[in-house]
């Protein structure tokens, strides 16, 4: 699959901010189109927001902040129920 994609819709997202509201990590459940495929797909996007805007860089986050980000995404219903059930099985 080509890396070039266009976000059609952000369905839900969880966010964790640090160093003020301008810097945040997000997990988004979104519908996207890839440039080499004409079908919309629902995906999870892990994003870094710098200065309030999506940064074109890797999201690098320490484990404690990741737990806070994951909790925010969970509380915001980013994950489908079947995904939550699969995660519960992994964590047992």
Predicted features along the sequence, with ranges:
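Negatively charged, low-complexity tracts enriched in Asp/Glu with abundant Ser/Thr
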Residues: 1-25
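Mixed-charge, Lys/Arg-enriched low-complexity segments
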Residues: 51-92
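A short, structured beta-strand/loop element
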Residues: 23-59
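Generic "edge-of-domain/loop-turn" microfeature
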Residues: 15-18, 34, 53, 66-68
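Compositionally biased, intrinsically disordered low-complexity segments
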Residues: 11-14, 30, 35, 64, ...
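A general marker of short, structured functional hotspots
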Residues: 9, 29-30, 44, 62, ...
């Amino acid at each position: 699959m080509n890396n070039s994609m266009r976000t059609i819709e952000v369905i839900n997202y969880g966010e964790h901010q640090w160093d003020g509201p301008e810097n945040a990590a997000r997990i988004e459940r979104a519908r996207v189109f890839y440039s080499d495929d004409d079908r919309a797909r629902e995906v999870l996007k892990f994003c870094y927001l710098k200065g309030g805007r999506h940064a074109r860089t890797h999201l690098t986050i320490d484990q404690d902040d990741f737990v806070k980000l994951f909790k925010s995404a969970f509380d915001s219903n980013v994950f489908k129920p079947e995904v939550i059930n699969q995660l519960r099985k992994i964590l047992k």
